[in-house]
Design a protein with these regions (language model features):
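Nucleotidyltransferase catalytic core that binds NTPs
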Residues: 1-199
Length: 199
């Protein structure tokens, strides 16, 4: 098994607040529990994880060994534009964390009720192969969520209002060093707002 794959899985479990024991890791990676236990022990011997009461946590060495990508959005109606963007973001690193906008954020930004609840949107995104962890964002402040995740790369969708320079400056103010990438899309016409208007 590739160390980066295991480290990315352990990182994602940590971000989601899940216990990263051998059973949970085995289920996530499709291993037998004893294989997962061996993976964890090997990573501990290499100084990449520490085992605390049977649960693995990445050390700074382990965290530096993987590239974490962060992307955020409303993701109300998952369409091909979203899937393309998520897939492109995933290719930038070893682990992809997707931050899902709160229902209250959707109400403020779009002036209407969310089409799908925040919990259902997290569950839906979690089911995508490219997504290592889907989490709820913090209302009104992307930087609180960024400080929790501590990504190496922030991937912005082609139509997101955040500006690359602004994100980089604000992150730096908070002690984060990260790269900001604006993703393109061959499907700029596919948008949730447009789909809703056509219904």
């Amino acid at each position: 098994m590739d160390n980066k794959h295991t480290l990315a899985a352990l990182f994602a479990m940590g971000v989601k607040g899940e216990a990263a024991g051998p059973g949970a890791l085995a289920k996530r990676l499709g291993l037998r529990p004893r294989e997962a236990r061996k993976e964890m022990q090997d990573l501990e011997e290499a100084g990449m994880v520490e085992l605390v009461r049977g649960s693995a946590r990445l050390t700074s060495k382990g965290r530096r060994s993987i590239r974490v990508v962060f992307i955020g959005g409303g993701f109300e109606l998952i369409h091909y534009g979203h899937v393309y963007t998520i897939s492109k973001a995933r290719k930038l690193g070893d682990a992809l964390v997707v931050s899902v906008a709160r229902d209250s954020t959707i109400r403020k930004r779009k002036g209407r009720e969310p089409l799908i609840s925040e919990g259902d949107r997290v569950r839906l995104l979690s089911s995508l192969r490219e997504v290592d962890a889907a989490i709820l964002g913090v209302e009104g402040d992307i930087y609180v969520t960024l400080q929790k995740v501590k990504p190496d790369i922030v991937a912005l969708g082609y139509d997101q209002y955040h500006m690359e320079g602004e994100v980089k400056r604000e992150a730096k103010k908070r002690g984060m060093k990260l790269r900001v990438v604006r993703l393109d899309s061959p499907y700029p016409h596919i948008k949730t707002t447009r789909i809703l208007k056509e219904l």
